[in-house]
Amino acid sequence: MPVKVLSGIDRIDLMDKVLKGRRVAVVTSGGAVNKDLVATLDVLVERYNVVKLFNAIYGVRGDFRYGETTPEYVDEKTGLTAYSIFCMDHVGPTAEMVKDVDVIVFDIREAGTRFFEYISLVASLMKACAAHKVPLVVLDRIAPIGGSIVEGTVCPPTMHNIVGDYELPSRIALTIGEFARYVNGEYGVGCDLTVIPVEGWKRNMYYDETDVPWLLPSPSLNCVNTNILYAGYCAFEGIASLSEGRGTSKPFELVGAPWLNAGKLVSELKKRDLPGIRFADVYFMPTASKHAKQLCYGIQSIITDRNECRPFLTALTIIDIIREMHPENIVYRDVTIGHTVREEESFPVFTRYIDKILATDAFSTGKMNAKELNDFYAPAREKYIERKKKYELYE
């Protein structure tokens, strides 16, 4: 039986203590709903004095596509103006935006990874709240891919951008509320932060082991297994010549290209004996994104054991094999493509998008293979695991 869980938005008694009688601004998006499937925005507008909305990326109801310019618009249902806080000249609200606000509420579904934009957004929001002396209330949600497994590379302290920041691993194993506590405590942000915790969730639980229905945190993350794969397979977004399955019904589960020898790839992957996952060679034709309307030869990744599967090591192993098989066909995506947000200065300066995703160029330049890279970052992951413990809210 699914475990009964209450998200932060369901903890009305706790919200009343920090929101009643105050002018409230709301940061939210599609997929953020309460136990009765009512949008967070509508719950808050009905109960509190909501005066303003902040649009993160996809609109306050998930009604925009990624990259659409939405500096300001009116939400039809509430009549409230939504201001973009994720745009070219700033990330986070400006002083002008918060001058008539007493408290900001944040409730957005995230993906449990460093490179999912909402992680960077909540950190930037905390900085802005600290600078403008506006309290922030985070309505916590389940960590969708559990809170026990940490994976991947760890950002260097000098790196600051929307896909890598705060010495985080690729798979962070924190809820959004725990992450906010971690950043505030470890990096001295100074945000007046309140986290309304989840009730009933434990760290080893995946999202679909609870009674909370899965609503898309972004258009491509359509189920828990896709989200698990994304924690490593996001690396494929950094290779322009390989489709990661966008434009199909199985994003990240499918990887391929018109030139790929999929049968040989599957044979080589079987030799690697990667845990918790199996592969089938398949044909697919994306309707959009890379190789749109072209027949692709590829693989389908099928998770057989979530607790054993390590998508980060798996994804980079797949890339290793493809580079050996088709070195002339690997084309890395330029670092500037797809970015609509001005970023803080980032050191080291990368020219390939995959390097920003991985927080290093050691893999794309061939200095390290998948296993070497994974092993190299093991000590940094262990340090992170120890650091984050004091900010965890759940056992």
Predicted regions located by residue number:
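N-terminal phosphate-binding or glycine-rich loops at protein starts, especially the Walker A/P-loop
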Residues: 3-49
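Glycine/threonine-rich flexible loop motifs
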Residues: 110-122
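Short internal beta-strands
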Residues: 51-57, 139
